A protein has these predicted regions:
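Bacterial N-terminal signal peptides
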Residues: 5-15
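N-terminal active-site segment of His-dependent metallophosphoesterases
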Residues: 19-100
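His/acidic metal-ligating clusters that form di-metal
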Residues: 32, 71-86, 168-173, 178-180, ...
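Active-site neighborhood of phospho(di)ester-bond hydrolases with catalytic His/Asp-centered motifs
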Residues: 41-43, 85-92, 117-123, 190-191, ...
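Structured segments of extracytoplasmic/periplasmic soluble domains
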Residues: 42-48, 71-81, 96, 108-115, ...
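Extended active-site neighborhood of metal-dependent phosphoesterases/phosphodiesterases
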Residues: 57-58, 98-201, 210
């Protein structure tokens, strides 16, 4: 019987605590905390931008760029219905770092501009292309050169409220963004493919400066084979 009364007392105390906690927040804050939201993710769109090696064409799939446009258009058109707070692209944006491929990617991603905030990270297909006699017609990621910054320039994204900063003040490769959703603060750290130690040091500092944020690390590949 004593156990029953103790449990009853604890339950009553907890219910009063819950009411007291809720009173500390406004109705608007409580509503936001209970609200669901969506984080949209785009992975590996390289075959939608396959103009240099034309592997998709060789394998019988043809020009697939319309899929890229349809995907970002769908995200834009469903932003309100799904409360899409942010979109991340996980890299391998293009097939072989060709300017015409980046032009396709730019057109597709620009559909989101002014509707859904987004950020991107680089994959191995997005950098360091070099022609070769292999079965694909070229090697990728032989170095870190990329056309990404021409088509997704830092100065454009620095104008958005979600933009936080970059590792290199002149480049957009390694960046951080932030957004609020469901009463929570989020920090996205976008890292290059197989990030260098100095980039990781920078990322750690960014995270340390935002102790109240939930952190999302966005990268196409974190570890090197060796």
């Amino acid at each position: 019987m004593k156990i029953f009364f103790v449990l009853l007392f604890l339950l009553a105390s907890l219910s009063q605590l819950a009411v007291a906690v809720e009173k500390e927040f406004s109705e608007e804050q409580i509503s936001k905390k209970r609200q669901s939201f969506t984080l949209a993710v785009l992975p590996d769109t390289q075959f939608y931008c396959d103009t240099r090696l034309k592997l998709s064409e060789k394998w019988g799939n043809g020009d697939l760029r319309h899929h890229f446009f349809e995907q970002t258009r769908w995200v834009r058109d469903n932003q309100k219905r799904l409360n899409i707070a942010f979109l991340v692209h996980e890299g391998d944006i293009v097939q072989a770092d060709a300017p015409e491929e980046w032009a396709i990617a730019k057109e597709a991603m620009s559909i989101l501009d002014g509707h859904v905030p987004y950020c991107l990270c680089l994959g191995n297909h997005d950098m360091g292309f070099q022609k070769s006699n292999n079965k694909y017609g070229g090697d990728i990621a032989v170095n870190r050169t990329t056309h990404f910054n021409k088509y997704f320039p830092r100065e454009k994204y620095a104008q958005t409220k979600e933009f936080g900063g970059t590792f290199d003040p002149k480049r957009h490769d390694n960046s951080w963004y932030h957004f609020d959703a469901a009463g929570m603060k989020f920090l996205i750290v976008s890292l290059e493919c197989k990030p260098r130690d100095e980039v990781l040091d920078w990322a750690n500092k960014v995270v340390a400066e935002h102790p109240e944020h939930r952190v999302i690390v966005l990268t196409h590949a974190y570890m090197r084979a060796n």
